Amino acid sequence: MSDDNQTKLEAADIQALLAVLPHRYPFLLIDRIVDIDGDVSATGIKNVTINEPHFTGHFPENPIMPGVLIVEAMAQTAGAISLLQRKTGRPGVVYFMTIDNAKFRRPVVPGDRLLLHVKKIKQRANISKYECVAEVDGVKVAEAEVAAMISVADENL
């Protein structure tokens, strides 16, 4: 699904992510992206640590990463690869639109390294749908389909 408005990039470190995503601590939920195949697929990496603020209340004696944050991390990975591939000088913003078929299979806890596999399964104009799978140590912990829209800074929603 490549076109003339895309550039070749195979990985993105935290600085590259900060350059394209509006999220910041504590809501930037990916640390790095690897295995980037254009705007079609990639793997986000989230190193889960006990220092994250949501563990204070979810749950104090048994810290578990909230499922909604796992889905958000998958969506950030999908959004980031869309934005990283753009060659246009106009900044874009990705708006999360839908979550479908979300399933949570096992808890994610501090110390886990969350791999967020995203693959574009559909695109129409500026709206893309991604199949997402989150894994820890090769075991599927969550999955969902997410849809998002890219909006260019000077366009109206």
Curated annotation (Swiss-Prot):
Keywords: Cytoplasm, Lipid A biosynthesis, Lipid biosynthesis, Lipid metabolism, Lyase. One of its GO terms (molecular function) is (3R)-hydroxyacyl-[acyl-carrier-protein] dehydratase activity. One of its GO terms (cellular component) is membrane. Its EC number is 4.2.1.59. The keyword Lipid metabolism applies. Coiled coil: none annotated. One of its GO terms (biological process) is lipid A biosynthetic process. It comes from the Bacteria. It catalyses: a (3R)-hydroxyacyl-[ACP] = a (2E)-enoyl-[ACP] + H2O. The active site is at residue 58. It is found in: Cytoplasm. Belongs to the thioester dehydratase family. FabZ subfamily. Involved in unsaturated fatty acids biosynthesis. Catalyzes the dehydration of short chain beta-hydroxyacyl-ACPs and long chain saturated and unsaturated beta-hydroxyacyl-ACPs. This is 3-hydroxyacyl-[acyl-carrier-protein] dehydratase FabZ. The gene is fabZ.
